[in-house]
């Protein structure tokens, strides 16, 4: 449990997790997360909460693909890749996982690239329940924590969003 706590805190300081919890993300704690390696498609994606000026709750966003690989329940590491999660192509810098039974939460610090020279660093949490068809009750929450190279491609630094899958299932898919 201490290894997991250290891993999660390396990924996301508690203040960011607390902010995402205030926005409404579900956090599944525990040291026995299910093996979630796979590719998942969230669509439609619906905005549940936001601190971004001008956002309208209920708006939809582009379909999101999430690829989770190399899960290790000894050190609670996992790799996270995204398409349209934040930008065109998203890659985790450091990531951790928690959960028990079929419930899990992935914590990531992700580099979102808009162009080869424009990128931002986001804190992101993905949460849900693993099923045979994908991730039930899929949610993802994000905060821009470093927009120094992001220009105007991303939401302002310090702001965040909570998004869910509109039909409550991010379906398993084979193509990333």
Give residue spans per PLM region.
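Glycine-rich, aromatic-bearing surface loops/beta-hairpins
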Residues: 118-176
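Short, cysteine-centered beta-strand-loop-beta hairpins and adjacent loop/turn segments enriched
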Residues: 47-58, 85-89, 112-120, 144-155
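Contiguous, well-ordered beta-strand patches that form the walls/edges
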Residues: 70-136
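Residues that flank catalytic or metal-binding motifs in active/ligand-binding sites
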Residues: 36, 62-64, 122-124
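N-terminal glycine/threonine-rich, aromatic-flanked beta-hairpin/loop signature
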Residues: 42, 46-92
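Residue-level recognition of well-ordered beta-strand positions that form the cores
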Residues: 41-43, 109, 129, 141-142
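Low-complexity, flexible helical/coil segments
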Residues: 28, 74-79, 143-145
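Amphipathic/hydrophobic helical signal segments and adjacent flexible N-terminal regions
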Residues: 1-54, 165-176
């Amino acid at each position: 449990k201490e290894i997991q706590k250290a891993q999660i805190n390396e990924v996301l300081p508690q203040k960011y997790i607390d902010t995402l919890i205030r926005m409404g993300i579900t956090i599944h704690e525990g040291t026995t997360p299910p093996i979630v390696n796979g590719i998942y498609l969230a669509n439609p994606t619906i905005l549940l909460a936001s601190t971004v000026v001008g956002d309208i709750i209920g708006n939809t966003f582009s379909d999101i693909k999430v690829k989770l690989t190399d899960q290790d329940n000894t050190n609670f590491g996992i790799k996270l890749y995204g398409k349209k999660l934040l930008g065109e192509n998203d890659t985790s810098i450091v990531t951790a996982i928690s959960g028990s039974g079929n419930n899990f939460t992935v914590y990531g610090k992700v580099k979102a690239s808009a162009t080869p020279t424009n990128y931002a660093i986001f804190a992101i949490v993905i949460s849900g329940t693993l099923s045979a068809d994908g991730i039930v009750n899929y949610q993802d929450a994000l905060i821009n924590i470093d927009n120094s190279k992001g220009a105007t491609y991303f939401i302002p630094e310090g702001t965040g969003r909570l998004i869910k899958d509109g039909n409550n299932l991010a379906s398993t898919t084979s193509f990333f």
